[in-house]
Swiss-Prot record:
Homodimer. GO terms for cellular component: cytoplasm. Keywords: Cytoplasm, Methyltransferase, rRNA processing, S-adenosyl-L-methionine, Transferase. NCBIfam families: PRK00103.1-3 (NF000985), tRNA_RlmH_YbeA (TIGR00246). Its main location: cytoplasm. S-adenosyl-L-methionine binds at residues 76, 108, 127-132. It is found in: Cytoplasm. This is Ribosomal RNA large subunit methyltransferase H. The keyword Transferase applies.
C-alpha cells in the first residue's frame, strides 16, 4: 500500500518534523509513506472573497498536479465526516482489501482547499470543528494513519 500526504507550504518547526519523522519510520513497516509539499501562494492579510478563491485555486492546481488518476483521495476539511479512530482504521483496511493500493490525503493551505480539489476527492475527513494549524495537522494525520495500522494489527498501541 502507498500512502501519500500532499500539503501546502513548507514545514519549518523542528518539533513537528521530528514527530512526523518518527511516525513515518514506524509506518515504513506497513506501507510506502511520503509527504509532498507544494508551495503556498503568498497573500496579504486581508483578502476579498475573489482573492481568497484565486489563492485556493492556484494552490489547488499545484496539489492536483501531484495526484494520479488511480489514487483514492481524501481531503481534510471542516465539512468532512468525523470518524472515530476505529472507523478510520476500518476504512483504510477496507480500501486495501477491495483493491485500492494508493491513498492520498490532502491538507490545504490556511484558506482551505479549492473547489477543484474538493471535487477530485473521493472522501472528506474532518478532525472536528476546531481550527488547527495546517502544519500541525501533518503530525496529527500521520499519527492517526499509524494508529489505524496498529488498530488493524490488534496492537495495544490504541487504548
Amino acid at each position: 500500500m502507498n500512502i501519500k500526504i500532499i500539503t501546502v507550504g513548507k514545514l519549518k518547526e523542528k518539533y513537528l518534523k521530528a514527530g512526523i519523522a518518527e511516525y513515518a519510520k514506524r509506518l515504513s513497516k506497513f506501507c510506502k509513506f511520503e509527504i509532498i509539499e507544494v508551495s503556498d501562494e503568498k497573500a496579504p492579510e486581508s483578502l476579498s472573497e475573489a482573492e481568497m478563491t484565486t489563492v485556493k485555486d492556484k494552490e489547488g492546481e499545484r496539489i492536483l498536479a501531484k495526484v494520479k488518476d488511480k489514487e483514492h483521495v481524501i481531503v481534510l476539511a471542516i465539512h468532512g465526516k468525523q470518524r472515530a479512530s476505529e472507523e478510520f482504521a476500518k476504512e483504510i483496511q477496507d480500501l486495501a482489501t477491495y483493491g485500492t493500493s494508493d491513498i492520498t490525503f490532502i491538507i490545504g493551505g490556511s484558506l482551505g482547499t479549492s473547489d477543484a480539489v474538493n471535487k477530485r476527492a473521493n472522501d472528506a475527513l474532518s478532525f472536528g470543528k476546531l481550527t488547527l494549524p495546517h502544519q500541525l495537522m501533518r503530525l496529527v494525520l500521520t499519527e492517526q494513519i499509524y494508529r489505524a495500522f496498529m488498530i488493524n494489527q490488534g496492537s495495544p498501541y490504541h487504548k
